[in-house]
């Protein structure tokens, strides 16, 4: 009930201003008696994934809490993990405003944020300050002004700084809003990046005495051949996991709606079937060797189960969480326990 009231107010506001207000409110009320307005307690359903035991299979996708300011608040809602970021080595403002658009009739969102964040050092401070014990994945990327050919260096910088404080690290090479970024999904650039990250992981595991798994986040806008090549590279480089998928450049399911022609990545309900199809193809190619987090368009518990049936072991929500509220977390966990 509280969320529906808050949502009604927020949906009257500019989307990005509403987002900032939500983050500020959550940050201010976490670990106080006021968190009773959104905290949820329900029977958990532990999942073993990439060698880590998660309390349940439902995570918050990257992009909601870019700077890790609300880890404790989101943990109180019942998320099994929170993926913060995307974070870059240096702070950057992102793309020009406006850059976030609701398509309410389709339960969808278009964004062209452009990795706006306060930088990796700020994120590390927030990771250290979190009190809840939440399992946090850190989604890392490259700065906009770093040439694609040198992008690997940005990922290695971020990885080294967040490693000690992460449950896992997600490598984002699939956002459509950073020029040239998606080219890292192909050929020698991909192999070089994955190989370098695995070598760095080995060094950091020895340094810190802990093994932090790394997962690759891919786009939905890939051909079957491209998915096969990515899967082959993941297996050859012994990556720990995959996250499928990021937002799409497609406008299927939203054509004609207000804001549908805005540039950027589309998320929400219209992405669901495309994302699930990519998960199925990727799972078939990986042959059970590498586990998958399924994300993209989950709006109901049934949507989440479809992704698990397609080959994912865990799921993440973002747009569906905005439209449905925290109850979606509990709904998915209960459906997972009952299957």
From Swiss-Prot:
Example GO molecular function: dihydroorotate dehydrogenase (quinone) activity
Organism (species): Shewanella sediminis (strain HAW-EB3)
Location(s), subcellular: Cell membrane
UniProt subunit comment: Monomer.
Major localization listed first in the record, in broad terms: membrane
Listed Gene3D superfamilies: Aldolase class I (3.20.20.70)
Bilayer topology annotation: Peripheral membrane protein
Family to which the UniProt record says this protein belongs: Belongs to the dihydroorotate dehydrogenase family. Type 2 subfamily.
Coiled coil: none
GO CC entries: cytoplasm; plasma membrane
NCBIfam families in UniProt: PRK05286.1-1, PRK05286.1-2, PRK05286.1-4, PRK05286.2-5, pyrD_sub2
Reactions catalysed according to its record: (S)-dihydroorotate + a quinone = orotate + a quinol
Residues binding FMN, per UniProt: 62-66, 86, 139, 172, 217, 245, 268, 297, 318-319
Cofactor, how bound (note): Binds 1 FMN per subunit.
Protein name, as recorded: Dihydroorotate dehydrogenase (quinone)
